[in-house]
A protein has these predicted regions:
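Short amphipathic helix-loop junctions that connect adjacent transmembrane helices
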Residues: 29-43, 225-241
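Cytoplasmic helix-loop-helix junction between adjacent transmembrane helices
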Residues: 103-138
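Helix-breaking motifs and short loop linkers at transmembrane-helix boundaries and internal kinks
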Residues: 39, 71, 92-97, 236, ...
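Symmetry-related core transmembrane helices of the 12-TM Major Facilitator Superfamily/SLC fold
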Residues: 162-180, 359-377
Length: 388
């Protein structure tokens, strides 16, 4: 009976987007506990946290081909339990090297799930002729925000390992049920996969879209890794609720994504991108100048809102260039986006070790200015055909 379970494809894909980052959100809220438990300074923590993006960066060149070879269903069925398990293993890490290795493995699984999720969402958009990409990523933000808030609430109740085990155990059956009856759109178009590393084979418009996403994901990676540490620095080492800064960032990122699809239809892709990037710039200005927590929280909110629609707009644009190469284009976009995740956090960490996090955050401005400039290159989806 369960095997015949059927979902509305739009509700189903949004549910999967919500579940996928939930345990990650719990882990992000627990980073200050891991840092103090392993006695890591800011630069050591930055090095350890490079594990996840390094794993994703290693896998993404092949993720598009794997998605087409194995199919989205198999990747979901295998990827979710392995992904949840590897994140849970971070609770067993007893040093920088083990933490890096476990996060690397989580990054490998996460890359396959990320590409598969975005490719599937793009296919659902084309099949249903509904604009849903921003809302899908809104549910992703809602999932990571909920996980972060749960992690903040539970961090004093148990160990990092037990909290992660409880959350992963509760979410695994939910993820499995959501993936049952996943519609197959594999044959809607004949997908051609090209080698990701051969940049000249990709159109110039895709490169511009990737540059736009790069500036956005630097911010996302920086906030994911350092927002909780920023709040802890501001409130003191014994402070409670250090995950609320990232929780607010993720909440407003989710809010922006839920309204993003309608705004894109009414105002156009390029204008929406510009306005939101400017919001992120204003939020970052507040973060590097704030002297109290409440003002900093306003900065987190504006920054989260500002970067909210960036990656979804980039995914839709990349998937709309050529139906036959959507998996390759989305994989390449994800690769460049993950480089943003990889570059931002360690630079901030090393600067913070010498000065403070506010100085590190200043290094995020050039990426946002680059995204603002490249926002004019974004394109809108045209269902059932190519966008020239």
């Amino acid at each position: 009976m369960i095997k015949s379970l059927s979902w509305n494809p739009i509700i189903q894909v949004m549910g999967i987007f919500f579940i996928q980052p939930f345990v990650l959100g719990v882990w992000l809220a627990l980073i200050p506990e891991v840092q103090s438990g392993l006695n890591l300074d800011a630069s050591q923590l930055a090095l350890a946290l490079m594990g996840a993006p390094a794993g994703m960066l290693t896998t993404l060149p092949f993720a598009g081909k794997v998605a087409n070879t194995l199919g989205i269903r198999k990747i979901f069925y295998i990827g979710f339990p392995v992904y949840f398990f590897t994140i849970t293993l971070t609770g067993l890490a007893d040093g920088l090297d083990i933490l890096f290795l476990v996060l690397f493995l989580a990054g490998v699984c996460g890359s396959l799930l990320t590409v598969s999720l975005n490719v599937h969402a793009g296919r659902v958009e084309k099949h249903t002729r509904r604009v849903i990409m921003n809302r899908c990523h809104g549910f992703w933000s809602l999932g990571i925000m909920t996980g972060s808030l749960l992690g903040s609430a539970l961090h004093s109740e148990s160990t990092v390992l037990m909290i992660l085990i409880m959350c992963a155990s509760a979410l695994f059956p939910v993820a499995w049920l959501l993936c049952l009856g996943l519609p197959s759109y594999e044959n809607i178009t004949s997908v051609e996969v090209s080698p990701v590393f051969v940049i000249p084979q990709f159109p110039t418009i895709l490169i511009c879209i990737c540059v736009f996403a790069f500036g956005i994901t630097i911010i996302e990676g920086a906030m994911a890794d350092w927002a909780s540490v920023y709040v802890k620095e501001m409130l003191g080492p014994e402070a409670q609720g250090t995950g609320y800064g990232f929780g607010l960032f993720a909440a407003f990122m989710a809010l922006g994504r839920f309204f993003g699809d309608n705004l894109k239809i009414k105002l156009g892709t390029k204008l929406v991108a510009r306005v939101f990037v400017i919001s992120a710039i204003l939020g970052l200005i507040i973060l590097v100048t704030a002297d109290d927590l409440w003002l900093a929280l306003v900065g987190f909110a504006l920054t989260g809102m500002g970067v909210s629609v960036g990656f979804p707009l980039a995914v839709t644009s990349a998937a709309s260039i050529d139906d036959k190469r959507e998996a390759s284009y989305v994989a390449f976009l994800s690769l460049i986006a993950l480089i943003g995740f990889l570059v931002g956090p360690p630079i901030i960490g090393f600067l913070a070790n010498v000065t403070n996090l506010k100085t590190g955050f200043i290094m995020l401005f050039p990426g946002l200015l680059l995204s603002l400039f490249m926002s004019s290159k974004l394109i809108s989806i045209k269902t059932g055909g190519n966008v020239k």
